[in-house]
Amino acid sequence: MSAPLKLKRQRSSEVRSQRKKSLVAELKPVASVLVDTPVSHLEGIYDYLVPQELSSAAVVGTKVLIEFGNTKTEGLILARKDLDASLPRLKPLLALSSPSGLIQPSTLKHIELVRNRFGGSFWNLLNQAIPSRVIREENVFLDKENVDEILPISEEIKSILGRADCLQLHTKEKLRWGLSLPLSVNPTWFISEIAKLRSHLGQVLLLVPDEKDLNSLRKVLHPIFGDNLVEYGSHLSKSLRYRNFLQIVDKCPQIILATRSGSFLPLRSNSTVIVFSDLDSSHYELHSPGWNTRDVTLLRSSDTSLIFVSASHSLEIERLMDVGWLERKRYKRSLNHNYGTSDGGQNYISQIKKAISKGNVLVSVAEKGYANLFLCSRCRNTASCECGGKLQISSEKMIPQCYLCLKIIVDWKCSFCGDNRPYVIAKGIDRTAEEIGRALNKTPILISSGSKQITELPSGNHVVLATAGSEPDGEYSGVILLDGERVFNRPSLRSEELARLLWFSLLCRADAEAEVFLSLPNNHPLVQSVLRNDSSYGSNLSLKERRLAKLPPYYRIAVIEGKNSEISKFAENLRGKSEYEITGPITLRGELSRLIVRSPLEQASNLVDLLDDVVKIQSIKARQVFKVRFDQFDI
């Protein structure tokens, strides 16, 4: 019996259906895809059909272009599976948007751990971990073979580290160290030697605060490792950054030099991550969800060695060393520094005169400018503008100007007593240079500050004045640390930590016979720390104070910003939970308020989940979502 006749449109529909089926991958035709969507409550895993022509390349860790709702967006393949008859009608993958398997499973696991700690969107973290695609770089990517080689150990590093620690660095696969830089030892040389010792055991990822540190290390390491050294960071062009990322993924170079954005880079087993100065603010990501290099590194796989190197460690690292999670390592050289302090009216000029005959002298000051704050010489009242702003003097011959409204006060007189003589109490770098110039009128003086930074010192002996972070590389026969009270007592949660880091970092540049002036009294804890050659001195007291005050590193802090009414309502709901400490709401501007929530370390994951859920509910209800940041550099 012949088959029943069918309408033409029925036959063509069946042909299209059969053709469609034949185009679907034969093996595991369904891909589980994590979809990149700006709507937080829709972020999730959805199933898509894998076309046959994409099947071999559409593996786990590949970015794909998909249709989601009425828009096209990116997705990430997390798994491949068989077709289930119970599944609804699925849409196909449209195209690949990355090389096949670009994102390794270890990287995905690492990102997920970071997301669990800081909350927010997985895709935000993924986009920060993986650079933007540049297709032409995939076409010109060169296939170079890297050759590992064992480098000799220098006698100088042996003498500093000691035989036992040097042997551990050279042979032990797994290390967790908190390492303090020794005074009068060049940090770039020291870190380079540590990297060389670890490089024959596995890859070494060096994470540094900024491009300046990266350039210094490159100058030392590139002549040794050549093409086996790869640089990575946001300072590179988009094309070069992507090219270097491909090389890191494909060729596994021995040494990777990177800034903060390299924190997620994939590494082989038994690799080493060296984090330099984790307390530096450049290690903190500003974009959501606001992670930092230290915590991202601590969340790496257990077969990775972690070495935190700093002139003075953050209290977070100090706590980990105190509980034994990190092993404390401190090294000392034989020094003959001549110390002077602010006790007894000691003057640093005499130490500059003594040091300048032997070499360059570094003078560290707190602020740029000339007279950033002045009083009346007679009655000691603050010089203020009519608008309430403080008056400043930008140079010796300039007239006072309001820092707030920029009004120039031509014939300034004290509004209290009528005197016209200013008394400067907050000197800037220019005023300090002027005073030193008067005392040493034949000595060349250089200023390195702001946009006018000196990277390399010219030949000859100079007095170099610099603000924090602007100091030229080099060794100094004198280090003069001014403005100690201002540096140590800034209105910041981390002011004491940062003052300690600044001073110990600069003392690493002093030669073994240097003249050193500390602008604080002899009994000050920071001065005692320097005199004992121990940057951790006093950290136990600081940690006890932080624990009692319910502050980091024993508490995690969430800063939440949103509309006044929403923040107030959320704060009231949260006050009923005894495990959280609430500060605020604090009115910011317009209709915005800020809430600060502190949680003990043991319960902080619950707070992360709670805030994630709140943001999702706000998104579902089409309300303005909260801006949430955990563990910011400062509050």
Regions found by a protein language model. Give the residues of each.
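Short N-terminal or domain-adjacent regulatory/targeting segments
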Residues: 153-167, 181-192, 393-404, 529-550
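Accessory, non-ATPase domains that flank or precede helicase/AAA+ motor cores in DNA-metabolism machines
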Residues: 1-334, 338-343, 354, 476, ...
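Amphipathic alpha-helical segments in well-structured domains
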Residues: 290-294, 429, 496-500
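Cys/His-rich short segments
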Residues: 357-439
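Hydrophobic/aromatic residues located in beta-strands of well-ordered beta-sheets
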Residues: 204, 306, 361, 515-516
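Short, hydrophobic beta-strand segments that form beta-sheet elements in well-ordered domains
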Residues: 206-207, 256-258, 306-309, 364, ...
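C-terminal helicase module of SF1/SF2 nucleic-acid helicases/translocases
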Residues: 60-63, 346-360, 435, 441-635
